[in-house]
From Swiss-Prot:
NCBIfam families: A_tha_TIGR01569
Extracellular side: 53-84, 133-164
Cytoplasmic domain ranges by topology: 1-31, 106-111, 186-203
Sequence similarity: Belongs to the Casparian strip membrane proteins (CASP) family.
Endpoints of the signal sequence: none
Protein name per Swiss-Prot or TrEMBL: CASP-like protein 2U5
Principal location listed in the UniProt entry: membrane
Keywords: Cell membrane, Glycoprotein, Membrane, Transmembrane, Transmembrane helix
Subunit structure: Homodimer and heterodimers.
Organism: Selaginella moellendorffii
Keyword check for Transmembrane: yes
Entry's localization field: Cell membrane
Xref: InterPro entries: CASP/CASPL (IPR006459), CASP_dom (IPR006702)
Bilayer-crossing regions: 32-52, 85-105, 112-132, 165-185
């Protein structure tokens, strides 16, 4: 009597279930990620608002003429680097808000979304860093005016403008650091598990 063998389907790769400890760690990491992104959103928004509203008008005495003064107004569009920083901060704030919304409405993060967030986290981190560094260099030149650069010491004439500019530079560097940490977490989400489930798994 011939034996009939029942064909057995090839085993599919099934991810092992997440333990209670892993679930707790994933939830904690997700909470940390959301907090970092919210803080980055706030810092980017503050940077943008502080720079856009940074404007001062002062009366400047003309050298050699004691009784002659001119009125001069300075604002963030004084240098292209500051305009670049405003744009970078605005993009960073908008992107972070988008990721926060996606994180709240979606319990799981698909691989496509994980790749999108990973790539843009890296990109925006470097864009913010470049913008903050360029703006800091221009601000330094305006504050100290090296003789070889033939710059005017703007900060000696427009103190409030420079103080407000300095505050925006501080928040821009803070947002860069926050984005760097978020980028590290998004890399972990993507590469620690092929199914991209660590922080956004249900349960």
């Amino acid at each position: 009597m011939s034996e009939h063998r029942i064909p057995v389907a090839a085993d599919k790769q099934i991810s092992p279930p997440i333990s209670a400890g892993e679930q707790k760690g994933c939830k904690g990491l997700k909470r940390t990620d959301l907090m970092l992104r919210f803080a980055a959103f706030v810092c980017c928004a503050v940077t943008m608002v502080v720079l856009i509203t940074d404007k001062q008008t002062s009366a400047i005495q003309v050298p050699g003429f004691n009784n002659l003064t001119i009125t001069k107004t300075v604002s963030f569009d004084l240098a292209k680097a500051f305009v670049y920083l405003v744009s970078a901060a605005g993009i960073g704030a908008g992107y972070t808000l988008l990721v926060l919304v996606l994180s709240i409405i979606s319990a799981e993060r698909s691989k496509a979304i994980a790749w999108f967030i990973f790539v843009f986290d890296q990109l925006i981190t470097y864009v913010l860093l470049a913008a903050a560094a360029a703006s800091t260099e221009v601000a330094y030149m305006g504050a100290h005016a090296p003789p070889e650069a033939s710059w005017l010491k703007v900060c000696s004439l427009f103190g409030r403008f420079c103080h407000q500019l300095g505050a925006s530079l501080v928040t821009s560097f803070i947002s860069t650091v926050l984005f760097a940490f978020s980028a590290a977490i998004s890399a972990y989400y993507l590469f620690s598990n092929t199914n991209v489930r660590p922080a956004y798994s249900k349960g």
